[in-house]
């Protein structure tokens, strides 16, 4: 989604460029509870059916330095270590048993590009690497990660002087359900959790899709020792490549648009551009591609929307066209009725109809009411209601996050 990408990109830029005095454990920077940031009561509830649940709140402070919030609401700036993969101190927040009273934490300062994490049964392991600004090593979706066998999930947020913006996302994975609610100047807002049974249904659907087309969809399903589903990863985190999966679809697209014009509206005042296939690229008249033509993308390019011809490079217009083309590839919406007019020509009912499509995203949308399933899932017909699963308030007075399917 646009807002989610913006907040994460801004947080990343701040981390990369912040110039901060060396950390001293005796410095008041070790833990900050500044009056400059408005206090925000946060309610962490366990409705998961599991009695041992830990929460974590991580992000950066307003200067871009990584922080963890402890149970007392204080922002703890991480020391800059001397060696790589240094374990981070335990900032876990123990929640009560499932169905018990919520645990209350009051944020005492702003947190940028943050996450609220939950883990079931055991604590998560976080690490930090040295640098001009230390880099946090978060739980990763690879089997060598020490948190691989732990059941965990997260939601994303930024809390700054402008607003609280928080969202759930399935861009990386589907796991334990999380719901949210807030109060403030924007009224009462809520975000629904993943419905009961959705995780198992998505896993089953991916296994069935593998049986149907032979692509490695089943490798996206992660189970524990008993065979229970822990999480379903998006194709960007697949342990094996999808190789030539998209080749047939791309061949048909390139053949079709060799003689049929493709018009893409960049929306937001960008304007529309029309192009046809010329050689191995779709060439849009009047569009500056910044030296990166729209050639045939790879499977990695399509699923990740962040490499090759779909990398959001150059001027705003090229980035907007790349985003809408990436969405059309993932949804298989270029060859359906109206597909030559993106994104307005195809309603959501026309998405994922081609046998070659992003079946992870298809199944997420089949079983989840809200939440994005790939990076440009915010692209849609002009005026369409967003389904990103976010809340936003310029003057929040409370924020609740619940682990479990029965939530807000």
Q: Where are the regions that the model predicts?
A:
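Compositionally biased regions
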Residues: 25-28, 71
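Extracellular low-complexity, O-glycosylation-prone Ser/Thr/Pro/Gly-rich "stalks"
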Residues: 36-408
């Amino acid at each position: 989604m646009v807002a989610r990408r913006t907040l994460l990109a801004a947080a990343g830029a701040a981390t990369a460029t912040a110039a901060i005095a060396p950390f001293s454990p005796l410095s008041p920077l070790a833990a900050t509870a500044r009056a400059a940031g408005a206090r925000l009561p946060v309610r962490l509830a366990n409705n998961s059916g599991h009695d041992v649940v830990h929460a974590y709140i991580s992000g950066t402070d307003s200067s871009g330095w990584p922080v963890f919030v402890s149970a007392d609401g204080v922002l703890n700036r991480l020391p800059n270590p001397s060696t790589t993969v240094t374990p981070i101190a335990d900032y876990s927040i123990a929640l009560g048993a499932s169905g018990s009273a919520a645990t209350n934490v009051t944020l005492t300062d702003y947190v940028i590009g943050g996450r609220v994490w939950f883990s079931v049964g055991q604590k998560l392991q976080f690490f930090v690497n040295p640098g001009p600004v230390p880099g946090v090593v978060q739980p990763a979706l690879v089997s060598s990660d020490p948190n691989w066998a732990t059941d965990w999930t997260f939601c994303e947020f930024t809390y700054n002087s402008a607003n609280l913006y928080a969202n759930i996302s399935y861009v990386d994975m589907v796991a334990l359900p999380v719901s949210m609610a807030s109060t403030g100047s924007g009224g009462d807002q809520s975000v629904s959790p993943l419905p009961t049974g959705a995780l198992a249904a998505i896993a089953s659907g991916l296994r069935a899709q593998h049986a149907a087309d032979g692509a490695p969809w089943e490798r996206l399903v992660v189970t524990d020792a008993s065979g229970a589903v822990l999480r379903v990863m998006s194709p960007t985190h697949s342990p094996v490549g999808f190789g030539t999966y998209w080749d047939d679809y791309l061949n048909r697209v390139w053949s079709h648009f060799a003689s049929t014009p493709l018009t893409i509206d960049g929306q937001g005042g960008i304007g529309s551009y029309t192009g046809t296939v010329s050689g191995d690229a779709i060439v849009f008249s009047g569009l500056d591609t910044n030296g990166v033509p729209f050639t045939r993308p790879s499977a990695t390019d399509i699923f990740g929307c962040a490499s090759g011809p779909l990398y959001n490079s150059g001027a705003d217009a090229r980035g907007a066209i790349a985003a809408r083309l990436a969405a059309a590839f993932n949804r298989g919406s270029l060859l359906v009725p109206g597909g030559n007019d993106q994104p307005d020509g195809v309603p959501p009912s026309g998405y994922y109809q081609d046998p070659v499509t992003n079946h992870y995203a298809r199944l997420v949308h089949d079983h989840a009411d809200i939440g994005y399933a790939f990076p440009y899932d915010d692209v849609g017909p002009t005026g369409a209601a967003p389904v990103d699963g976010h809340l936003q308030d310029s003057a929040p007075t409370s924020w609740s996050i619940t682990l479990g399917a029965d939530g807000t």
